[in-house]
């Protein structure tokens, strides 16, 4: 069995294989300030004839505010009030406006475990696959059903395995790797499949680097993006759950059946850039060098961790941000922000001319601060570059690694980080 088949077998209480339809028990459900209000409304619709309108298990639900925080409109403030009230009445854990982005906060708080079946009303919920969980995004209507029953139906997905070997070259990182894979298979290459990332390269990555990989599985159409749990996973979880021991069961068997397997050697991989207006429009940085920039956005659930921002800051050194360029730095969580603060990186970046914001989604969702105007060009370490994703539909967004973002912030144009 693949690890995905094992997880669905546990969740449904019976052995299953790819293609089977199952009613599965959910281990953890997450919603946030954008999709949560509709889920709550749907929950009360489902429960309208019930005398006691209670969620199935409040200990397995997490609500987090991260998209419009602090509230940037009256509507956002009203949504926050509604969700706070719901969380209090139901006894649900609510991470308010000060904690950070859902896909960073849940793992760092110990909510995600290997073998879990996790759903979130956000498309990048696949990020938790970095810890060996099967996690996937669902809509608010499905989330309402989960709130009420703790169950959801699935078609057990086929698995697309990516075997990656070789040591990543200097100043080439996991973001370059996942962009390369997406560029190779396309935005629908793994549609409704469990993307399973394996091989010596993947095993060499830290958990933050793995989070970047799993986070972007949806950008190749993946239902989930799983990396088998190992000693690196165990060490990460032991820091959050004292005495945690990894169960070796949660990995694919040697005889597991895959829909497809692709092999990659990344020993000579160059820094990669996703060009407007699709994530699979991927080119080597050498092909787009010199593209003038108005803004660089460093952050998001894809690359907003301490490791990421440190990479960018170290490349920039003591040099200032290029004239005419706005550098926005948005850490993924309060915990990551405090690490940066204690290490001196916040002061260093601000002295260089960066704007360091409180932890949140920031420009990534296109509805808060730091948006691009018509004709403007931005480089971002986030995960999507569709038209209008980070502001005007007439703007242009390129996606890159933190290293490329740092080098480009110095020069004011897309720059190969190996040349700085």
UniProtKB/Swiss-Prot annotation:
Molecular function terms, GO-annotated: 3-isopropylmalate dehydratase activity; 4 iron, 4 sulfur cluster binding; metal ion binding
Cofactor: [4Fe-4S] cluster
Catalytic activity: (2R,3S)-3-isopropylmalate = (2S)-2-isopropylmalate
EC number: 4.2.1.33
Positions with a binding annotation for [4Fe-4S] cluster: 301, 361, 364
Pathway given in the UniProt record: Amino-acid biosynthesis; L-leucine biosynthesis; L-leucine from 3-methyl-2-oxobutanoate: step 2/4
Family: Belongs to the aconitase/IPM isomerase family. LeuC type 2 subfamily.
Assembly mode: Heterodimer of LeuC and LeuD.
Protein name per its UniProtKB record: Probable 3-isopropylmalate dehydratase large subunit
Organism: Methanosarcina acetivorans (strain ATCC 35395 / DSM 2834 / JCM 12185 / C2A)
Gene that encodes the chain: leuC
